[in-house]
């Protein structure tokens, strides 16, 4: 899981999971039914027209991901996501549909989701969800299959604008679209089992049975620096195509740097590009998507 910023609030360690976060920080008790579902088929039908050619270059997705069946991993992720929401709800930490911040996030999602099939055709079939969990932890994620969650800490502590929130959502969605979790789990399991990509592709079995048990790993999965850079750039373009100012990607990570004391701590640095390098990469790519943003704003 891309714990977007493996950050810790000042004087208070970030809990290892959202359930622990909810219990530790004692958020206001919320009631209300669990969040909404967006039918990806309908969303794709209303997708805004745009250039099919990506403006940022991230190369091809890893072939290793083929070792894990996408359908199996997505089903496992859906089960884990449902359990997580149920736990949050039992602790009064799941935002109801009427919560203003949740409505804001879903409005952003409604603009981003129709554009996602340009990066992964499977996204047309995903049943997207966006939910909000009460926790001081600075975090957000998107599981395989389009299951998104934000923690209130990332909204409240960073004082995010809509453009900045869209950059975070785009980044997390990009991890799912580029199937980073699928690739990382496949590499890990294949290595531990002594399997080669060639042997798998020649029909010597898949990791399907293992994938069915991978849901619990998704909440602690750490992506590589390459994965993080890909997610930054794909998320940048996705948000720009939806009409969100790409300059917000820079201001977002400047805020992240300040929130983490300028470094982010060992856990952050182990899986993310350093702050200055990340910002420079984004700054170099903003001009490539600026035209997409301006076109989207013109309607």
Q: Which ranges hold each PLM region?
A:
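A Zn2+-metalloprotease active-site environment signal
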Residues: 2-299
């Amino acid at each position: 899981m891309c714990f977007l910023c493996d950050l810790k609030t000042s004087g208070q360690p970030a809990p290892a999971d959202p359930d622990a976060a909810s219990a530790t920080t004692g958020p206001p008790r919320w009631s209300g039914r669990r969040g909404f579902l967006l039918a990806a088929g309908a969303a794709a039908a209303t997708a805004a027209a745009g250039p099919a050619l990506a403006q940022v270059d991230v190369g091809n997705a890893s072939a290793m991901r083929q070792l894990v069946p996408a359908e199996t991993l997505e089903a496992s992720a859906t089960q884990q996501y449902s359990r997580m929401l149920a736990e949050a709800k039992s602790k009064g930490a799941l935002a109801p549909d009427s919560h203003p911040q949740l409505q804001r996030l879903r409005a952003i999602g409604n603009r981003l989701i129709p554009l996602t099939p340009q990066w992964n055709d499977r996204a047309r079939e995903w049943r997207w969800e966006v939910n909000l969990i009460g926790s001081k932890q600075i975090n957000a994620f998107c599981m395989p299959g389009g299951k998104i969650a934000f923690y209130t800490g990332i909204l409240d502590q960073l004082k995010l604008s809509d453009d900045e929130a869209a950059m975070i959502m785009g980044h997390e969605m990009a991890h799912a679209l580029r199937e980073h979790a699928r690739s990382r789990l496949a590499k890990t399991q294949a290595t531990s089992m002594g399997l080669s990509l060639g042997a798998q592709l020649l029909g010597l079995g898949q990791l399907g049975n293992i994938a069915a048990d991978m849901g619990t790993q998704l909440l602690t999965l750490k992506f590589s620096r390459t994965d993080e850079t890909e997610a930054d750039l794909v998320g940048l373009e996705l948000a720009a195509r939806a009409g969100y100012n790409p300059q917000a990607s820079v201001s977002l990570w400047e805020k992240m740097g300040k929130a983490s004391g300028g470094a982010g701590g060992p856990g952050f640095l182990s899986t993310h590009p350093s702050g200055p390098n990340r910002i420079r990469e984004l700054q170099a790519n903003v001009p490539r998507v600026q035209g997409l943003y301006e076109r989207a704003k013109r309607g």
